[in-house]
Amino acid sequence: MAADSTPGSHHRNLFFQYGKAAIHRYHRLHLYGKAFIWLVILFYIAFGVFVIIVTPARIAQFLYDQAKLLAATRFGWVALLLSIICISFPPLIGHTTLVTLCGFAYGMKGFYIAFAGSILGSALVFVVLRFLFTEKIRSWSAQNEKWQALEAVVRSKGLPLIVLIRVSPFPPWVYANSLFASIEPVKLWQFVAATCFITPKLLLYVFMGSKMAALSDGDQRDRMDTHDKIINGLFLAGSLVIAVFTSWLVYNLVQNHIRHLHGVDPETDELAAEAIEDFDEDAPLLSPTASHRV
């Protein structure tokens, strides 16, 4: 019995729980969803083989050269900003990659591009989806208990709760935009204000991009002594660890907060938390089967 209470046992149990949940979700996917997952796996295997054959140094140098070419282009920043706006629309992905590219190509000045693109893109998604699917949202929420609970909680707690959900890493960027557009009590100004709170995350990814650029260029690497290379590598690794840890921490804090809101029925809390966890299956603007059930 004592062994079951050790930290190692707790982590193993947590790992198995997440594993079972992932397998359960996989089995519930449509055939196309399963095929997509396997295509992604094959892509990463092929990408890994490609990196090994071409070598990371040559790939990094090529990417650095292209990034600097983009930065030297007169309207390169406009292209990057428009790209961030475009990938804010579902089902496109790549927000984190493009934000990191802002730092890779422009250094810390790239933060302004990342911030402007993120704010404009998310606001545009919110307005377009809300305008096009208002009736669908109302019809869906009228017959979905989890969604009613989520809307009730958001309506009750307002902007502070919207901010907490927005800074959470789950749901991911593009799906979070759709999620908030699906929650009728959320106003545009609240959504934009909450999105401004992702500034620290944007700064972190832009910083990581700037450090990756310094280590990718062969000329810069040659001018660095061992100490500088280690420092840059530690900065990059530390930033990655911070990003992963804070994402995990914030998500768990948000879920715990939603489940223990003061002045809200515990059952409503639980249903609201489940609505966020199952966003890909239940959200009226995300689920491929939603249109058939509304």
Curated annotation (Swiss-Prot):
Q: Name one GO cellular component term.
A: Golgi membrane
Which topology term describes how it sits in the membrane?
A: Multi-pass membrane protein
The reply to whether Ligase figures as a keyword in the UniProt entry is no
A Pfam family annotated for this chain is: VTT_dom
Q: Give the main location.
A: Golgi
> Is Transmembrane one of the keywords UniProt gives this record?
yes
- What domain of life? Eukaryota
Q: Which residues cross the membrane?
A: 35-55, 75-95, 113-133, 188-208, 230-250
- State where the protein is found: Golgi apparatus membrane
Q: Where is this region: VTT domain?
A: 103-212
GO biological process terms, semicolon-separated = mitotic spindle elongation; vesicle-mediated transport
Write out the topological domains of type Lumenal: 1-34, 96-112, 209-229
Q: What does this protein do?
A: Golgi membrane protein involved in vesicular trafficking and spindle migration.
- Its recorded name reads Golgi apparatus membrane protein TVP38
Provenance organism: Coprinopsis cinerea (strain Okayama-7 / 130 / ATCC MYA-4618 / FGSC 9003)
